């Protein structure tokens, strides 16, 4: 018996389909179907995932889509060939682009004029099975039209079937079996019910007729299909399948080609740009080694026809530089000297051991991947440039699939099952991001619920099933698809939630599977901060205008790093990096490259950190098994740290080709997911034995490579980041006021909150002054400091005030530059402020110079007439109602609630006078305590981290009035104090002090932390304070 299934919703028909596309295809293969059509509603979002599984199984996949038109007619459109696929994709694009995100609008006229070659299955209903509709469909699609019949074993189907037969006979329409499958197996019916309830924002018990009438909407065994449908209707499924011969493999990407001047070939234009760039990079002459690498790269680029790709990225980067937007390529592209000469990347060949095979490989036969970071506050300028240059028909962002995670699954499933909302909320909040779904049992038991109850068991099962289900499409962080022809010829395009952006329906993995080009236009906050720092510094030190003006290898900068004074510094400001810095003690740029890469899961899991540090301290000899291995590992003292080293070792020690070594890299990247790395073990070890290495060493080396897993950090990536790391370090060391000021103006970014940055700035002796209408600019700014320690103070800007209109803030600053404000009434009149603007300024104490205190400012702001015409230049009368100044505690609360920080006393400075905080040590006192001593500390919770390499250990950062306290919480302690650990704003921690012991060869600064034994939540003492921590960053 033969059968092709033609009507399938996967879970990419969001909140209707109850199975993944791959599950649908695999089940069709197991059931012996000849073909299966994936027909998600106005979507091809699941098509690639279905295609990959179909290729693996060897079953025919038909690409199609279901539509409900504006006249309520329903149909399926299937793509028989490449031209029809482009029509279908374009039709989906049209329907999606004319509606809001997540919706679509399609009309019958659209269908007639735009789907000229697709096969159409009309799905009549009781309301649409009319003579008029039959006449319209028949006239429009003629020999490409079928009348679809679904038999779901529901009431009234026999009467409808007779009606459909009459229409089919009248208009000579062949009838075809069109059984709607919402799930690959009947066992998913409860989940499908839950999805329906979520879709309708209600519970399953309240759905009524909106539920599927039974559980028949699944892929049935072929004998069941033959029982349900006449043979003639099943035969038509096969005839349709025979006509549908399109495969997604037919999609071919074409690069944009208008970037090449007339009369030049693409490679000639690229060579000319490279020649110009290398003359600027090496004004004294190009080194012979660089010339050789360039010749090799350009030859391979020409052979693989990647010229247009490089020209496209070059054009985008050139635009950014013309607009003074800081940008820098990173990742594997930093292995390319061509990218260096095009000023896409900044890593010179001599700075690292470039490995072009990591970037482009002939054997790999896939496009290269260039990631470029841009200033996060100006990246939108670059994005809109791309849209303008190529048009929205030829450029769109890649999608990201937003899927259910534990917390969202608990909330939605709980609501759908009608569970107590308070219980559902408690469970969702109590489940940390690292918890497995199985831990939900513990959380429910802790809430006093009997887990053996049937409803609770069903809840567990449904939460497990829905995790990983797609919820909706969002936009990728910056992956652009840019094409020579219309993007919609390849993949449908829809509106993003952000105005001015469009998104394709495929994600990064889909694009990789199809070999389609993606240019990553990424956002990096540190680039914004660096540009703003340089702009401020340049005003008083003209010699420093760009990153290129920063002196290299500055000893004072490295002294600062060795002391772990890195709050705000790019890439090395985390707890783990601060702990490593005094041990590694970087003194050169390459040391920074290693520092950034070594605090990663790969080197840690591969047991590479401690051997490297011992060798660096001279406590362990450095040895190499051969000169070839020495060439690879000498920069890292014989210990493999970088991903490129693993690739090189496979080539020089085990005899792998460049392509084989790259496949090894890919296996390393997916090792944690599927264990593919083990298939290389025998080849690797045998190759090493053939090259004369000992078996024990071969096994040991492979184990180290295996330890990299998916976490081995590329040297090229680390080196790109090290450039920004050094630049931010130098600026913090030599121009700290400008650096901190720029960080405040570049939020949100980085590891630390504005409050923490200000605390650190003040510890460095930099005065920080409050927002004030007679002194502040829109953004925070530098002003001369009356201090012998520093020439500059930071004046906080209006952007720190929550909810203040940015245009109003700019007007205040612009008008004040002409003449200071005398009173609040004049401020309102001259700057055109609303009463709401004034109230926000008063609440933030930004009217202090005009009113004296918050209470007076509130009263005076409230007394200002709203009509601008009634204002005059006279100040308010001197006998205005007197209002007592607020208390320090109230001022502190208002500060945090309006600006997220306070320049007054730290909250701990007030609490310190009370029990039990009076018994707690301050951060600055910890350095004088001995290792192992019992200690109590208290502070605001500013950060929680749980790195994957820490074996379940959680790290807390507490802030008191003297600094940051590092707290280590072992796994056993986490469970006992879980609620306090996850939700508290103010903690007292009781535990033991631990301090690292410097090695015999160094006087490095010891790292101090508290190992928690008890965690006591005192958040109620700060209930009115708007505090937020940066958790698991």
Curated annotation (Swiss-Prot):
Where does the record place a coiled coil? none
Q: From what superkingdom does this record's organism come?
A: Bacteria
The chemistry this enzyme catalyses reads: DNA(n) + a 2'-deoxyribonucleoside 5'-triphosphate = DNA(n+1) + diphosphate
The protein's UniProt keywords, in alphabetical order, are: Cytoplasm, DNA damage, DNA repair, DNA replication, DNA-directed DNA polymerase, Nucleotidyltransferase, Transferase
Q: Which InterPro entries match?
A: DNA_pol3_alpha_NTPase_dom, DNA_pol3_finger, DnaE2, DnaE2/DnaE/PolC, DNAPol_HHH, NA-bd_OB-fold, NA-bd_OB_tRNA, PHP_dom
Broad EC category: transferase
- Note the PANTHER family from the entry: DNA POLYMERASE III SUBUNIT ALPHA, ERROR-PRONE DNA POLYMERASE
User: What is this protein identified as?
Assistant: Error-prone DNA polymerase
Species classification: Bacteria, Pseudomonadati, Pseudomonadota, Gammaproteobacteria, Cellvibrionales
* Gene coding for it: dnaE2
